[in-house]
Amino acid sequence: MESKFAHIIVFFLLATSFETLLARKESDGPEVIELQKEFECNGKQRWPELIGVPTKLAKGIIEKENSLITNVQILLNGSPVTMDYRCNRVRLFDNILGDVVQIPRVA
């Protein structure tokens, strides 16, 4: 029991001796990060009207409305994805019922 208490004390001492990674002075001001796209994509980019639509139907609509889209991925909501940006790709995130739950967009 004493060793557990000692471990807890050491943990709190170590934890309070470090600043958090996100800590900064208020006088530093807000930091703005500007993300740059290497290129602009042509055609329709977003389909907010497809929320709640079955993913297979949504896939067909996207391919019909933007012929430059050659890669429509259907993924379960919360699935890990790569962060690279491709003008020919749209990801459809669905739920277990097979309906679109996030706004499909070129990514």
Swiss-Prot record:
Residues 1-23 form the signal peptide. The keyword Cell division does not apply. Pfam families: potato_inhibit. The record marks M83, D84 as: Reactive bond. It comes from the Eukaryota. GO terms for biological process: response to wounding. Keywords: Protease inhibitor, Serine protease inhibitor, Signal. Residues 24-36 form a propeptide. The keyword Heme does not apply. One of its GO terms (molecular function) is serine-type endopeptidase inhibitor activity. Mechanical damage (i.e. insect chewing) to this plant results in the systemic release of a factor from the wound site. Within the leaves it induces the cytoplasmic synthesis of proteinase inhibitors I and II. Inhibits both chymotrypsin and trypsin. Heterogeneous tetramers of similar chains. Belongs to the protease inhibitor I13 (potato type I serine protease inhibitor) family. This is Wound-induced proteinase inhibitor 1. It comes from Solanum tuberosum (Potato). The lineage of its organism: Eukaryota, Viridiplantae, Streptophyta, Embryophyta, Tracheophyta.
